[in-house]
A protein has these predicted regions:
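An acidic, low-aromatic, low-complexity terminal/linker signal
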Residues: 1-156
Length: 156
C-alpha cells in the first residue's frame, strides 16, 4: 500500500447517526452543534414547505427544517416527539428535525463509498456518499447541500 493510500486508510470520521423515515443517516460530528428536543416551533408564513418554522434555543433563533418534507417522505404517524440536530451555516443556526438520534460512530474513510446506482433519487440528492454497515446502508448527509437548498427562496 502506498503512503497516500495508507494515509486515507488511517483517516477516521465521526458521525452522529440519525433516523429519518426508516433510513439511517450520518452527519459529520464536526458539523453538529447541538442535539435537542424542539419545544415550540413557530410557523413562518409564506416559507418553503420544508421550513417547519423557527424556535428559540437558549436565546438563539433557529430555523427548523423538516427533514421528512425535505426528502419528500410522508409525515410521521406516531406520537413520538421529534428530535433535532443543530447545525450552523454562514452564521445562521438551523435545526434539522429528525425521527431519532442514534449513536456516534467512528468510520474509516477507506470504507466510504460513492452512492450506489440504485439509491433512491431523493436520498442521492442529499448524499455525500455511503457506508455499508451490518446489514444497513448509512447515507452521509451533505449538510451544506441540505441547508443551501432549504435556504434558497422559491422561484415565483
Amino acid at each position: 500500500m502506498s503512503n497516500e493510500n495508507q494515509a486515507i486508510g488511517d483517516q477516521v470520521t465521526e458521525y452522529v447517526t440519525v433516523m429519518i423515515g426508516g433510513q439511517l443517516f450520518g452527519l459529520p460530528i464536526s458539523r453538529v452543534q447541538d442535539v435537542f428536543m424542539p419545544d415550540r416551533v413557530t410557523r413562518v408564513p409564506l416559507s418553503a414547505p420544508e421550513i417547519a418554522g423557527v424556535l428559540n434555543l437558549r436565546g438563539r433563533i433557529v430555523t427548523a427544517i423538516d427533514m421528512r418534507r425535505r426528502l419528500g417522505l410522508p409525515p410521521r404517524t406516531d406520537d413520538k416527539p421529534s428530535m433535532a440536530v443543530g447545525i450552523e451555516l454562514k452564521g445562521e443556526s438551523y435545526g434539522l428535525l429528525i425521527d431519532t438520534v442514534g449513536e456516534v460512530m467512528k468510520l474509516g474513510e477507506d470504507t466510504r463509498e460513492p452512492n450506489p446506482v440504485n439509491l433512491d433519487a431523493r436520498l442521492a440528492r442529499v448524499s455525500a456518499g455511503v457506508h455499508r454497515l451490518d446489514g444497513q446502508l448509512m447515507v452521509i448527509l451533505d449538510v451544506d447541500y441540505v441547508l443551501n437548498t432549504a435556504a434558497e427562496p422559491m422561484a415565483a
